């Protein structure tokens, strides 16, 4: 079969609420995730029978069995009992690594979609979702994209029919990293006394999010975007001067709708009603962002993953 390629879009968290601890040790979450048009690109070409290989435009990214692209390919072969299937995969990396933007998860989800097509496996959406959920907490969302309520570890999805599609000014200091396990551990240490423990309590919070002002704004049922909640930001920002500085910079120019950290960070974003407003803010902030070591991108939120 001739070569194929698919885009692997980034995401941001418009809401990240840590509800409590699950029996399996993971945190129970209530989130709103949003796909952006910033994307990696994954291509596949033929290879000798049984051979899987991955190359990447960014030499910092591991291309061995620890990479979710390779894990996804191997999971597909196991699921179908087809060890002879082969692929030469190449990734063009545009999403910053380790940034809280689900770049790795999106790459893994895209590998599932791409290889399902390339190998003509004809797996159903449900089968792909189950494989995605096994690969990682954000992979199931990245498989579908758009704007979604995400519950459980992030694998339980409810699509939101949104009217608002804000522009996004995204910033990240490439010299700063945040360990996701560390962030969740700190959250448990600092906020754990308020954790919920019963399924009834979890469901009450899920329902509150479904009926929240944020959802009303996304559906254009109210004009004012409320402050965005990220429980990990509450604990990470006080420990990270770069995150604090970035949030302050984003809030200082262009009258953003709201500013927040994405996921466990360290990526930060500001929302604007349209691209011209985001571009004006980027222009105004560019000197200060450069002075403080931040890379920056203007992105658009999208209604679907646009594979």
UniProtKB/Swiss-Prot annotation:
GO biological process, one term: terpenoid biosynthetic process
Catalytic activity, EC: 2.7.1.148
UniProt-recorded Gene Ontology molecular function terms: 4-(cytidine 5'-diphospho)-2-C-methyl-D-erythritol kinase activity; ATP binding
Keywords attached to this entry: ATP-binding, Isoprene biosynthesis, Kinase, Nucleotide-binding, Transferase
Pathway: Isoprenoid biosynthesis; isopentenyl diphosphate biosynthesis via DXP pathway; isopentenyl diphosphate from 1-deoxy-D-xylulose 5-phosphate: step 3/6
Residues that, per the record, bind ATP: 96-106
Pfam family, one: GHMP_kinases_C
InterPro entries according to UniProt: GHMP_kinase_C_dom, GHMP_kinase_C_sf, GHMP_kinase_N_dom, IspE, Ribosomal_Su5_D2-typ_SF, Ribsml_uS5_D2-typ_fold_subgr
Broad class of enzyme this protein falls into: transferase
Catalytic reaction(s) noted: 4-CDP-2-C-methyl-D-erythritol + ATP = 4-CDP-2-C-methyl-D-erythritol 2-phosphate + ADP + H(+)
Catalytic residues identified in the record: 11, 138
Assigned protein family: Belongs to the GHMP kinase family. IspE subfamily.
Job description of the protein: Catalyzes the phosphorylation of the position 2 hydroxy group of 4-diphosphocytidyl-2C-methyl-D-erythritol.
Official protein name in the record: 4-diphosphocytidyl-2-C-methyl-D-erythritol kinase
Organism of derivation: Synechococcus sp. (strain RCC307)
């Amino acid at each position: 079969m001739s070569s194929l390629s698919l885009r692997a879009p980034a995401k941001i968290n418009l809401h990240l609420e840590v509800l409590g601890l699950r029996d399996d040790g993971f945190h129970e979450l209530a989130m709103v995730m949003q796909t952006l048009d910033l994307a990696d690109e994954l291509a596949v070409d033929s290879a000798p029978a049984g051979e899987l290989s991955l190359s990447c435009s960014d030499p910092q990214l591991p291309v061995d069995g620890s990479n979710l692209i390779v894990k996804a390919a191997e999971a597909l072969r196991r699921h179908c009992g087809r060890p002879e299937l082969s692929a030469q995969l190449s990734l063009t990396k545009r999403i910053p690594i380790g940034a809280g933007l689900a770049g790795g998860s999106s790459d893994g989800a895209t590998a599932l979609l791409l290889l399902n097509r390339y190998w003509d496996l004809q797996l159903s959406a449900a089968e792909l979702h189950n494989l995605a959920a096994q690969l990682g907490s954000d992979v199931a969302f990245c498989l579908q994209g758009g704007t979604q309520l995400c519950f459980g570890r992030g694998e339980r999805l409810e699509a939101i029919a949104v009217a608002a599609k804000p522009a996004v000014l995204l910033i990240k200091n490439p010299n700063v990293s945040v360990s996701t396990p560390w962030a969740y551990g700190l959250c448990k240490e600092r906020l754990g006394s308020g954790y919920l423990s019963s399924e009834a309590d979890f469901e009450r919070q899920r329902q509150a999010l479904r009926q929240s002002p944020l959802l009303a704004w996304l559906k254009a049922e109210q004009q004012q975007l409320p402050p965005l909640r990220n429980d990990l930001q509450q604990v990470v920002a006080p420990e990270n001067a770069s995150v604090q500085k970035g949030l302050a910079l984003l809030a200082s120019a262009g009258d953003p709708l709201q500013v927040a950290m994405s996921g466990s960070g360290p990526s930060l974003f500001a929302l604007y009603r349209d691209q011209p407003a985001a571009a004006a803010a980027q222009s105004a902030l560019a000197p200060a962002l450069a002075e403080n070591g931040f890379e920056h991108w203007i992105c658009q939120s999208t209604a679907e993953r646009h594979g």
